[in-house]
Amino acid sequence: MRLKNEIEYVFGILLYLTINGENRIISSNEISEKEEIPHLFSLRILKKLEKADLVIIFKGAKGGYKLKKDSSEITLKDAIESIEGDICIKDCLESPESCTLRKGNCGVHRVLKDIESQFISRLQDVNFRDLADGKY
């Protein structure tokens, strides 16, 4: 399993907004420049973050972006799911009938489900305030 570069950009944008956007609205140009993300790509990502209720878009000449909620409430899981949707290691974990081994009734299925649960739990434990504060 490999996270897309887009996810890395999401992490960068959310960290930048956490560190620099607490008391001000930040322009997409500033975010793109500081995080070294192509501007049009950052706009697409910011739109996805808005759709996921993680950022607010302020329109107009002095418009920009701000976190919608406190950064301590935004987790790595939220960030990944804003781009990827629900996290699922293997389709058969969500739909056992799609299991190619034993229709979801196998040791591999049970182990992967446990690994997926631990992975998601860990992603939920890490928030952007703690990341910005250097707790990891």
Question: Model-derived features: where do they sit?
Answer:
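Non-DNA-binding regulatory cores of transcription-related proteins
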Residues: 68-136
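Minor-groove-contacting beta-hairpin "wing" of winged helix-turn-helix DNA-binding domains
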Residues: 61-68
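N-terminal helix-turn-helix DNA-binding core of bacterial DNA-binding proteins
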Residues: 5, 9-37
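Conserved acidic, metal-coordinating active-site core of Asp-based
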Residues: 58
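Basic amphipathic alpha-helical segments that dock to polyanions
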Residues: 42, 46-50
